[in-house]
Amino acid sequence: MAWRSGLCETDSRTLKQFLQEECMWKLVGKSRKHREYRAVACRSTIFSPEDDSSCILCQLLLLYRDGEWIICFCCNGRYQGHYGVNHVHRRRRRICHLPTLYQLSFGGPLGPASIDFLPSFSQVTSSMTCDGITPDVIYEVCMLVPQDEAKRILVKGHGAMDLTCQKAVTLGGAGAWLLPRPEGYTLFFYILCYDLFTSCGNRCDIPSMTRLMAAATACGQAGCSFCTDHEGHVDPTGNYVGCTPDMGRCLCYVPCGPMTQSLIHNEEPATFFCESDDAKYLCAVGSKTAAQVTLGDGLDYHIGVKDSEGRWLPVKTDVWDLVKVEEPVSRMIVCSCPVLKNLVH
């Protein structure tokens, strides 16, 4: 008996986009005739299963039969269907301290297909043995941003730009941006210099500026929307199935309070922003401004510190490095968080 499956044109484009752009695939089984992959995705705005969509478990069988690739797709334990495609490109991603992952891309639209069997997928196991994207991973893969490149990344302003400039997307809080490029995502953010991190940093959290400003201003009150975990993160390595608690390793954090002036509640992380004992407020806007601001402009164009009277104080600059993280780690960070993913997809 032949099993047929197909999609309308709109659904085909949406599913293809989801499988290619929002999933990092783990190889869980193979034979001479097939490969089986698994991915764990967070909530998506373009693809939503019928049941709880806060965590999307994706299982995919890849077959090559009669000159055509066949994709059999299962989502959250429910078989979604099988589809034909002209070409499949599998890109292996080896990342330090992490298991090998794959990115899949499909040549041409997903079309109807016919198979003579009902696909069976491997039993799903879930484990917390992998720590995911840790500070060690970030410091290993990140690169310092040269000044000439930083000057070409526009983060504020519109109007006429140099033809070499590119506009980045601001990610929530302070000091983090994403630049979508044809070759993939590039994350730019400020992070504590490595020597300072090793000597006095929290070795579990990624010490990004956005994380530390959120920690410094967190009021800690139950029910505070700024301080409460949105409970939508997933494990980007696909080892753990389900939503994971916040581990301080994302770039989705925002200050607790107005972006222009958030009260300091926790002194320890606040010391990374200002030397003065008079520091009262942290600001996710700069003490200086211009019609157009690039990453090459000084730190005081991006953040600020105020005293109790609202006067600007000098910002610490020597403790921060402007770094960039590229594919595939950049995509893993974005696609493990529904907040970041919604900003860029």
From Swiss-Prot:
Coiled-coil residues are: none
The annotated region (Nuclear localization signal 1) lies at 26-35
Pfam families recorded for this chain? Herpes_UL16
Lyase recorded as keyword: no
Query: According to its UniProt record, where is this protein mainly located?
Result: virion
Q: What happens when the gene is disrupted?
A: UL94 deficiency mediates HCMV-induced transcription of type I IFNs and downstream antiviral effectors leading to impaired viral replication.
Q: Where is this region: Nuclear export signal?
A: 55-63
Q: Does the keyword Nucleotidyltransferase apply?
A: no
Q: Which GO terms describe its biological process?
A: symbiont-mediated suppression of host innate immune response
What are the entry keywords? Host cytoplasm, Host nucleus, Host-virus interaction, Inhibition of host innate immune response by virus, Late protein, Viral immunoevasion, Virion, Virion tegument
**Stretch list, region Nuclear localization signal 2:** 90-94
Q: What is the effect of changing residue 63 to A?
A: Almost complete of cytoplasmic localization
Per the record, GO CC terms? host cell cytoplasm; host cell nucleus; viral tegument
* Signal peptide segment: none
Locations listed in the record: Virion tegument; Host cytoplasm; Host nucleus
State the function annotated in the UniProt record: Plays a critical role in cytoplasmic virus egress. Participates in the final step of tegumentation and envelope acquisition within the host cytoplasm by directly interacting with the capsid. Upon virion binding to target cell, a signaling cascade is triggered to disrupt the interaction with the capsid, thereby preparing capsid uncoating. Additionally, antagonizes the viral DNA-triggered antiviral immune response by targeting host STING1 and preventing its dimerization and trafficking.
On subunit structure and binding partners, the annotation says:
Interacts with cytoplasmic envelopment protein 3 and with the capsid. Interacts with host STING1; this interaction prevents viral DNA-triggered antiviral immune response.
What protein family does this chain belong to?
Answer: Belongs to the herpesviridae cytoplasmic envelopment protein 2 family.
Kindly provide the name given to this protein in its UniProt entry: Cytoplasmic envelopment protein 2
Q: Which organism is it from?
A: Human cytomegalovirus (strain AD169) (HHV-5)
